[in-house]
């Protein structure tokens, strides 16, 4: 029998629904602009006009523009992890990471969006933090992902850390490498390959490059098949 993942209607107020829908709408309108514009050139006034809100309403949801990017990245991480977990339930933790990279490729929808997000992140003095995202916001952001509202909010970096720890524990990886070192390698592959693949003259797609870099990493670390 299928498990129902719908939030109980009586447990959700109209105010909560409106808040969640508005926050997601603002974020998605901002990201839509970022596909074509520079981060600095995006006007909060225009974003609010697009979603039919007063300009001041924006600040009820986000303190500044960079918070929208952080929020979107948290949503992207959420969907990537949700898909990776749904596509396989075995004990192979490295395969889970491989699937996460495949999911990331599916989320790369615009070269300019990727460049602007990376640039905005580099300018931040601190690493992006995990943001509070309600179950309603998760559902409204990804209405085609049943049950995603039940997925815990976790950054991809933390997901990698947990998966590598489990991979060492279950014997997929030898314990001689530090978990943090492997996570740094994964983050380097994630961002570096994303940028390098744009200049690849062989016309190979991003998924190929990610698969290749992960294969090289796992081989170098001494991956063992379960």
Identify the function of each model-found stretch.
Residues 1-9, 106, 158, 162-170, ...:
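C-terminal peripheral helix-coil segments that are non-catalytic and often amphipathic
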Residues 20-32, 78, 129, 158:
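A short, Lys/Arg-enriched amphipathic alpha-helix from helix-turn-helix/homeodomain DNA-binding modules
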Residues 25, 33-71, 75:
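Helix-turn-helix
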Residues 43, 115-119, 176:
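Short, hydrophobic secondary-structure boundary micro-motifs
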Residues 71, 85-124, 183:
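Hydrophobic alpha-helical connector segments
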Residues 79, 83:
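Conserved phosphoryl-transfer catalytic core
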Residues 87-88, 118-132, 193, 197-201:
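Secondary-structure edge/capping motif, primarily at the C-terminal ends of alpha-helices
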Residues 125-170, 180-184, 208:
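Amphipathic alpha-helical packing segments from all-alpha helical-bundle domains
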């Amino acid at each position: 029998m299928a498990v129902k993942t719908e939030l109980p209607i009586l447990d959700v107020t109209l105010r909560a629904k409106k808040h969640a829908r508005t926050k997601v709408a603002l974020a998605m309108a901002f990201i839509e602009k970022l596909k074509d514009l520079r981060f600095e050139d995006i006007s909060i006034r225009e974003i609010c006009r697009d979603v039919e809100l007063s300009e001041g309403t924006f600040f009820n949801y986000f303190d500044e523009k960079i918070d929208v990017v952080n929020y979107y990245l948290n949503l992207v991480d959420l969907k990537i992890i949700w898909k990776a977990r749904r596509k396989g339930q075995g004990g192979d933790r490295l395969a889970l990471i491989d699937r996460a990279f495949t999911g990331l490729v599916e989320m790369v929808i615009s070269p300019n969006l990727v460049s602007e997000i990376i640039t905005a992140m580099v300018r931040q003095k601190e690493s992006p933090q995990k943001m509070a995202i309600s179950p309603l916001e998760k559902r409204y952001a990804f209405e085609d992902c049943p049950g995603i509202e039940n997925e815990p909010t976790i950054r991809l970096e933390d997901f990698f850390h947990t998966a590598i720890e489990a991979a060492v524990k279950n014997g997929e990886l030898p314990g001689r490498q530090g978990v943090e070192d492997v996570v740094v390698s994964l983050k380097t592959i994630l961002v570096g390959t994303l940028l390098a693949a744009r200049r690849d003259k062989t016309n190979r797609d991003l998924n190929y490059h990610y698969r290749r870099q992960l294969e090289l990493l796992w081989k170098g670390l001494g991956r063992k098949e379960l």
